Amino acid sequence: YVQRPGDGLLYQTKDHIRLDFGWEVVAKCFFSYRPEVAVPDIRQIKLQTGDRILLCSDGLYKSMAPDILQARMMDDKPLEEILDVYDFLCKKQGDDNYTAILIECF
């Protein structure tokens, strides 16, 4: 996720997962035995002061509604406090492991 104060969500990556017989299967990854599918998705975004970038696993974004995740991301709080809220929500509502890195541009 890339968000800008006042503008909201600028960019969100697409998850390369598909369902196969009820199981989630990675449909695309960088490390592959088939080089033709190992093409990275690259987007260029001009970042500004105050922009925030959230790198996270599916364990985080599947543990809460997208509007809650995005709203908390732009809270006027220190990044550690926002990550603590994510941690609380994942422990309360999630059933998977989770990882999150939240970055603020200066």
Predicted regions and their residues:
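Hydrophobic beta-strand positions
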Residues: 2-3, 64
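Short acidic-glycine loop/turn motifs at beta-strand connectors
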Residues: 3-8, 105-106
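Conserved, helical-rich catalytic subdomain that frames metal- and/or nucleotide-binding sites
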Residues: 6-49
